[in-house]
Design a protein with these regions (language model features):
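C-terminal-biased regions
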Residues: 1-55, 59-74
Length: 74
């Protein structure tokens, strides 16, 4: 079920021990409560998948969906 409202694109950053992944996601400003944007269930599941693939170092999958940054030792 899609939430009714204005759709906006936002960049979200998913951080793990070895990577930071930047992905663009869609947020919705609901017409019933426009106080703040929210995620639809599909977007929440996508963000979970990004984190899971980052933890597994699945770089091919991650690069197909966003930008991948590697952590370096200080």
């Amino acid at each position: 079920m899609r939430i009714q409202g204005q759709r906006i694109k936002k960049m979200r950053f998913i951080q793990t021990d070895h990577y930071v992944v930047a992905v663009e996601v869609e947020m919705v400003i609901p017409t019933d409560d426009p106080s703040e944007p929210c995620y639809e269930p599909e977007t929440v599941e996508f963000l979970r998948q990004v984190k899971l693939h980052a933890e597994q170092s699945d770089l091919a999958w991650l690069k197909a969906r966003g930008k991948v940054y590697a952590a370096v030792a200080a």
